[in-house]
């Protein structure tokens, strides 16, 4: 069972977090903060599956709820509020275990917000919006654009990330295909793209001949573990 924490976001509100660490496995020395997507909080099957699976592979995994999810609201807050929440969580985790390599990331929206706080600010950005210092960023299903709106790219900040970035993407993801991500990654400083052949935005494969979802997810977890291991070497 994960340890449960309460993290104060400001003087009036705290959000819940969970820490997954499997004492039976060899510790990698790395922590991954994994943020949820827009439609489901940290207790969704996807989030719990990945938190448990990655902790079984030697990572210390921290999940949390963005404020809107903690409050039971369906619509996400605007990006500045999401970023501020993620920054508070990152600062708390770093203060708690400063000796560990710190990675941030998430599913879909959670991964996008992680990339945004890891990116260097543009001239004129507000104070307090500088890049958080992390060992790397993991995006599981990066939402490059809204479905059916490929002209509305969410990529301007990505070249400003100096830390290594791993993007795991379904080849049939309506939020961004391998072809669409290619030119974006070419402009990034240290980016790795892992494609799930036939995969959708949830990294699942819908065809009848596809492997079971847990087998696909296990392969993704192995990819994340191996990538983190190479980064911290």
Predicted regions and their residues:
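Serine-hydrolase catalytic machinery in alpha/beta-hydrolase-like enzymes
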Residues: 5-102, 129, 203-211
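The conserved beta1-alpha1 loop
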Residues: 33-37, 141, 169
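Short alpha-helix in the alpha/beta-hydrolase fold that links the catalytic acid
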Residues: 47, 151-154, 163, 176-185
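Primarily recognizes the serine-hydrolase "nucleophile elbow" in alpha/beta-hydrolase
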Residues: 86-163
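Short beta-strand/loop motif that positions the catalytic acidic residue
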Residues: 160-162, 167-169, 173
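Acidic catalytic loop of the alpha/beta-hydrolase fold
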Residues: 171-175, 201-202
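Catalytic histidine neighborhood in serine/cysteine hydrolases
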Residues: 187-205
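Catalytic active-site module of serine/aspartate enzymes centered on a nucleophile-bearing elbow/loop
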Residues: 207-233
């Amino acid at each position: 069972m994960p340890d449960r924490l309460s993290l104060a976001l400001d003087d009036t509100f705290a959000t819940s977090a969970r820490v997954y660490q499997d004492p039976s496995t060899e510790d990698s020395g790395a922590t991954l903060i994994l943020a949820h997507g827009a439609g489901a909080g940290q207790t969704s099957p996807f989030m719990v599956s990945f938190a448990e699976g990655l902790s079984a592979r030697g990572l210390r995994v921290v999940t949390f709820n963005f404020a809107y999810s903690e409050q039971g609201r369906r619509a996400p807050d605007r990006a500045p509020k999401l970023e501020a929440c993620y920054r508070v969580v990152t600062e708390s985790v770093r203060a708690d275990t400063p000796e560990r390599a710190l990675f941030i990331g998430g599913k879909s929206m959670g991964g996008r917000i992680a990339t945004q706080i890891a990116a260097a600010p543009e001239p004129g950005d507000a104070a307090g919006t500088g890049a958080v210092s992390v060992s790397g960023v993991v995006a599981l299903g990066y939402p490059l654009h809204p479905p059916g709106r490929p002209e509305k790219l969410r990529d301007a900040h990505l070249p400003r990330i100096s830390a290594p970035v791993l993007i795991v993407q379904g080849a049939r993801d309506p939020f961004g295909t391998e072809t669409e991500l290619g030119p974006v990654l070419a402009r990034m400083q240290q980016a790795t793209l892992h494609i799930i052949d036939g995969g959708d935005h949830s990294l699942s494969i819908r065809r009848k001949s596809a492997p079971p979802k847990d087998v696909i997810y296990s392969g993704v977890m192995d990819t994340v573990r191996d990538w983190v291991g190479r980064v911290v070497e």
